[in-house]
């Protein structure tokens, strides 16, 4: 019997393993940490922001083993009742979170070519956890599944239909776990019923996306088949004319691999500013008179406002605009610049509410007479993953807290 059940949440990236341990009763985080530099000589683990310690083994199983040792040191190893995994891409196969079985692992492996950098890493985490935590139910939570409610007209590209039929080329969308969590919080904050509601959510971080949520379901989103489409991001270009890329290739002789690196790693805020992908650095530079930092920020907010307005067209009514993610939660400048560009909706920002720090938590930042309220809601993907694990996993009766 587990007296104090906890949920271990694992997010295996292309070179890191982020993890959290949450109290299963309250879903409050007890431990957070990261094993970084996986599969390199400099691999390390850091817990609760503490000093990094080198990993004895540098692969994913070594990272999970180090996490297990940290749990043992805190007498939590025997308390792990469930494990929730963030899986980057569920393709068209997974429309919701699911308990992990051998069949599910095989299905994830089959669709992993859609996200090779992340899905194979995710599976490495699943296999390592299976070995280190035998008998503990694991649950897969897909970054794409929330968007499986998109209609064909929202997910199809204007390409020959055979590419969709034969290759699965379509919009899948990402940040689904974040958009789903924030939408659920927004119904309470804005005092609106989920079953008759229209929200546009802006998840703004180094990666950024917009999602239109109608009656609790995603009906449109800005990211596409990959997380490259849509908004200008930290190092990703977002929407770009393919003809422009073809012209660059012709003029420079760059290969497809070269251009893929450019649009993913050298573009966005970094590419326009020539300075940094970090918005905090760019905001300071703008105030110091750096012209291209200003240009990068204004391009960033123009694209955000345009996508918010466009996504509102997928709703029957706009009940609220919600900002989340590291930038959405913490940058009063970005929220101000974006809402200034949304006056067509009758949005009126309250400067005092907007100026509150991110630590102020969930809050409405518009005036009482604003036609459409805007809010800040901190995302909590780890909590959403833990809640899904609790809802779907097999838990000892003593842990029947859901």
From Swiss-Prot:
GO MF annotation, one: ATP binding
Alphabetical list of InterPro entries matching this protein: Ac/propionate_kinase, Aliphatic_acid_kin_short-chain, Aliphatic_acid_kinase_CS, ATPase_NBD, Propionate_kinase
Assigned GO CC terms: cytosol
Ligand binding (ATP): 11, 18, 175, 203-207, 278-280, 326-330
Cofactor: Mg(2+)
Top-level taxon of origin: Bacteria
Annotated site, Transition state stabilizer, chain positions: 175, 236
Alphabetic keyword roster: ATP-binding, Kinase, Magnesium, Metal-binding, Nucleotide-binding, Transferase
Active-site feature positions: 143 (proton donor/acceptor)
EC number: 2.7.2.15
PROSITE patterns assigned: ACETATE_KINASE_1, ACETATE_KINASE_2
GO biological process, one term: L-threonine catabolic process to propionate
Disulfide bridge partners, by residue number: none
Reaction(s) catalysed (UniProt annotation): propanoate + ATP = propanoyl phosphate + ADP
Annotated CDD domains: ASKHA_NBD_AcK_PK
Pathway: Amino-acid degradation; L-threonine degradation via propanoate pathway; propanoate from L-threonine: step 4/4
SUPFAM superfamilies per record: Actin-like ATPase domain
One Pfam short name: Acetate_kinase
Residues that coordinate or bind Mg(2+): 11
Transmembrane segments annotated in the record for this chain: none
UniProt cross-references to PANTHER family, sorted A to Z: ACETATE KINASE (PTHR21060), PROPIONATE KINASE (PTHR21060:SF17)
Role summary: Catalyzes the conversion of propionyl phosphate and ADP to propionate and ATP.
The family this protein is said to belong to: Belongs to the acetokinase family. TdcD subfamily.
Assembly description: Homodimer.
Protein name in the entry: Propionate kinase
Organism name: Enterobacter sp. (strain 638)
Gene name, Swiss-Prot/TrEMBL: tdcD
């Amino acid at each position: 019997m587990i007296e104090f059940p906890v949920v271990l949440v694992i997010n295996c990236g292309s070179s890191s393993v982020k993890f959290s341990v949450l109290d299963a009763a309250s879903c409050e985080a007890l431990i957070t940490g990261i094993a970084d530099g996986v599969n390199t000589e400099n691999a390390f683990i850091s817990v609760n922001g503490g000093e990094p310690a080198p990993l004895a083994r540098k692969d994913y199983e070594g990272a999970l083993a180090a996490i297990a040792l940290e749990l043992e040191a805190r007498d939590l190893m025997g308390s792990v009742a469930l494990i929730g995994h963030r899986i980057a891409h569920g393709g068209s196969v997974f429309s919701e979170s699911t308990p992990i079985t051998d069949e599910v692992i095989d299905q994830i492996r089959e669709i992993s070519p859609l996200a090779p950098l992340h899905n194979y890493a995710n599976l490495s985490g699943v296999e390592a956890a299976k070995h280190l935590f035998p008998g503990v139910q694991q649950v897969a939570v897909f970054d794409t599944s929330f968007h499986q409610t998109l209609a064909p007209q929202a997910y199809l590209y204007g390409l020959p239909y055979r590419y969709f039929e034969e290759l699965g080329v379509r919009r899948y969308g990402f940040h689904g776990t974040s958009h789903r969590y924030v939408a659920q919080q927004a119904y309470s904050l804005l005092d609106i019923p989920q079953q008759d509601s229209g929200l546009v959510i802006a998840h703004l971080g180094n990666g950024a996306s917009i999602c239109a949520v109608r009656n609790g379901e995603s009906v449109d989103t800005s990211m596409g088949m990959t997380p490259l489409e849509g908004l200008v991001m930290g190092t990703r270009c977002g929407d770009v004319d393919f003809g422009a890329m073809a012209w660059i290739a012709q003029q420079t002789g760059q290969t497809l691999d070269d251009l893929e690196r450019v649009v993913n790693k050298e573009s966005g805020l970094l590419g326009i500013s020539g300075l940094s992908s970090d918005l905090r650095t760019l905001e300071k530079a703008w105030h110091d008179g750096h012209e291209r930092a200003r240009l990068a920020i204004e391009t960033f907010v123009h694209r955000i406002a345009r996508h918010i307005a466009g996504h509102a067209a997928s709703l029957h009514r706009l009940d609220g605009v919600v900002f989340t993610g590291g930038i959405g939660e913490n940058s009063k400048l970005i929220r101000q610049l974006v809402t200034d560009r949304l006056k067509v909706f009758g949005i009126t920002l309250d400067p005092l509410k907007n100026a509150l720090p991110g630590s102020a938590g969930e809050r409405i930042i518009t005036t009482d007479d604003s036609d459409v309220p805007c809010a800040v809601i901190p995302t909590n993907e780890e909590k959403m993953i833990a809640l899904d694990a609790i809802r779907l996993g097999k838990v000892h009766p003593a842990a029947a807290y859901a």
